[in-house]
Amino acid sequence: MTVPTHDRLAIVTGADSGMGRATAQLLASDGYDVGITFHTDEAGAADTRAAVEQRGRRCYVARQDLTSPDTGDTVDHLAEQLGGLGVLVNNAGTGHRGRALDLTYARWREMLATDLDGPFLCAQRAARRMVETGRGGRIVNITSVHEHVPRLGAAAYCTAKAGLGMLTQCLALELARYDITVNAVAPGEIATPMTGMDEPDAFREDRPGNPTGRPGHVDEIAAVVAFLASPRASYLTGRSIPVDGGLMLMAAHGHDMADGSWREL
């Protein structure tokens, strides 16, 4: 069997910390040169760049605003520096907690622009390049378990992630003929700055409502992304893979809750 081999050139958005940094580092360990983006944390992006270069790979850095209609230009810019593009990891995103009744249109649009519009524009630019080169490729979208199940106080976030999950399937159908796979990774609660935790918290925080009893570690997300980016995943496309410690299995245990405090934001 001959498996198409895409270029070992990857772009990871939002790689200045957390899951993005872990993914960039693991891809570098797997032999990829990496382009990374950041929004405001330039120092964090510099640390990620140093970590990639310590692994003997090239790394280029660019600031990116996912709410801009021109955000796809960043993908083109990094791809030009890399000399091509074989893998895009749409990792960057944002979150917001609050009642839907209080959600302003501006905040709603900001959430959808960051978590859905921006990833679409990045994927579109990446796919065009992959089609043009004719060597296939991989697109991995980081969604959330809330692509699949709702969360109180996160209407805009859940809507955007659900949309990104459906976009993953639509792109997978359209791009399969070009040997481009498109998949999603749906993390549960992961110990990152976005969730107010440090990486070691993954193994010292207690989570009774999760079958594993703890949050996830960024390396556990990066490992799945790296698999999907590899030739070993060449027959897997259009799927969303929850990496949540079994959290989504717990729905039937809602009757075990002692009170209705979960309703309060």
Question: Which positions does each model-derived feature cover?
Answer:
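Residue(s) in the substrate-gating loop at a strand-loop-helix junction
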Residues: 144
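Short, small/polar-rich loop/turn modules that mediate ligand/substrate recognition or access, typified
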Residues: 176, 181, 236-238
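Alpha-helical segment proximal to the catalytic Tyr-Lys
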Residues: 128, 173-174, 234
